[in-house]
UniProtKB/Swiss-Prot annotation:
Cofactor note: Binds 1 zinc ion per subunit.
Name under which the protein is recorded: Small ribosomal subunit biogenesis GTPase RsgA
Entry keywords, A to Z: Cytoplasm, GTP-binding, Hydrolase, Metal-binding, Nucleotide-binding, Ribosome biogenesis, RNA-binding, rRNA-binding, Zinc
Classification via InterPro entries: G_CP_dom, NA-bd_OB-fold, P-loop_NTPase, Ribosome_biogen_GTPase_RsgA, RsgA_GTPase_dom
Chain segments carrying region Disordered: 1-30
EC number annotated for this UniProt entry: 3.6.1.-
Keyword Transit peptide: no
GO MF annotations in UniProt: GTP binding; GTPase activity; metal ion binding; rRNA binding
Gene encoding the protein: rsgA
Obligatory cofactor(s): Zn(2+)
PANTHER family linked: SMALL RIBOSOMAL SUBUNIT BIOGENESIS GTPASE RSGA (PTHR32120), SMALL RIBOSOMAL SUBUNIT BIOGENESIS GTPASE RSGA 1, MITOCHONDRIAL-RELATED (PTHR32120:SF11)
Length: 350
């Protein structure tokens, strides 16, 4: 009996897992450096600007970048974390310091992982930039998934649609109508092109305050946007899969960049499936900001806002107060939540 042929995605996943295992095996001694007190300097404040498998790059108050080990007692360290660290009196195996503690986070972005439970991505974020693209098509369902995460994390969101240069006149009108759905409920939107430069000045101005993070599926052009905003970084850009239209992951670790006009930008690895399995039904419902005015006014207290009689949300949809596409996506999220909850269980992130 012949073996089943693996898809390109399956082959890449196997290769990636194999590479990670080899990396951990070859470098495990590096993470086991036994830093004694007499080998370290004074305690200092710093910010994590890059996170690797067993190390992190920390920026001190003078702007110097130091590669550090992590104390085994630390549960998680992510880009954007404000940490307490100590510099080694000498460099050991390419490492110059150790992170001793993580300051309390103002907020964090997490995503569920099938094997590791909830996995933090970044911390202390002022703004989430949801990057989508007009090709292969503009997915409002994926945008809504990201918005639920933004609302549950209490982090402001901006919707950015890239590759506007590929739009015909008719398609541009259609995308404009789709974005109007979000503008009506208070979200800022931008239709841009990293290739032609359309509206890139507006995006750059938006990033000039606080710390922003780009999130979005692979292939939407996050790396191309970073190349435009920070040409000196020369982030690697990936080629779209001819089969699926989804791009291969081109960023291997989360990084924080300082922008010349002010502000910081975090780029994180692409996420093809941004799961919401760690959220319950109530959290997803609260993730739809236009629902808030009507919640608590349904006929029945346990209304699920699906096919229940006397549902105030359904009535608002019929009266044009809630967009039907958003309500349809809500149905999809709740259905997928019910299906996944029966299969998976996720632990809390710390």
């Amino acid at each position: 009996m012949s073996k089943r042929k693996l898809t390109q995605n399956q082959q890449r996943r196997i290769q990636s897992n194999n590479a990670k295992t080899l990396h951990r095996h070859q470098h495990r001694h590096k993470s086991d450096i036994d830093w004694q007190d007499d080998m370290l300097g004074d305690f200092q404040d710093g910010t994590v600007v890059t996170r690797y498998a067993v190390h992190a790059d920390v920026e001190n108050e003078q702007g110097e970048i130091i590669r550090c080990n992590l104390r085994r007692t630390l549960k998680s360290v992510v880009v954007g974390d404000r940490v307490v660290w100590r510099k080694g009196k000498e460099q050991l195996q390419g490492v110059r310091g150790v992170i001793e503690a993580v300051q309390p986070r103002h907020n964090q972005i997490v995503r569920p992982d099938y094997y590791d439970g909830l996995k933090p991505i970044a911390a202390n974020i002022d703004r989430i930039i949801i990057v989508s693209a007009v090709l292969p098509n503009l997915s409002l369902n994926i945008i809504d998934r990201y918005l639920v995460v933004c609302e549950s994390s209490n982090i402001p969101a901006v919707i950015v649609v890239n590759k506007a240069d590929l739009l015909s006149s008719e398609a541009r009108i259609e995308v404009g109508l789709q974005l109007e759905i979000y503008r009506k409920i208070g979200y800022e939107t931008l239709l841009i092109s990293a290739k032609s430069g359309e509206n890139m000045e507006k995006l750059t101005a938006l990033l000039s305050e606080g710390t922003s993070i780009f999130v979005g599926q692979s292939g939407v052009g996050k790396s191309s946007l970073i190349n435009y905003i920070l040409p000196e970084v020369n982030a690697q850009t990936g080629k779209l899969s001819q089969v699926s239209g989804l791009g291969q992951h081109t960023t291997t670790s989360s990084r924080l960049y300082h922008l010349s006009q002010g502000g910081n930008l975090i780029d994180s690895p692409g996420i093809r499936e941004f799961g919401l399995w760690h959220l319950d039904r109530e959290q997803i419902t609260n993730g739809y900001r236009e629902f808030q005015y009507f919640l608590g006014t349904c006929k029945f207290r346990d209304c699920k806002h699906l096919h229940d009689p006397g549902c105030a949300i359904q009535l608002a949809v019929k009266e044009g107060k809630i967009d039907p596409l958003r309500f349809e996506n809500y149905h999809r999220l709740i259905t997928s939540l019910s299906e996944t909850k029966s299969q998976r269980h996720f632990i809390s992130a710390n």
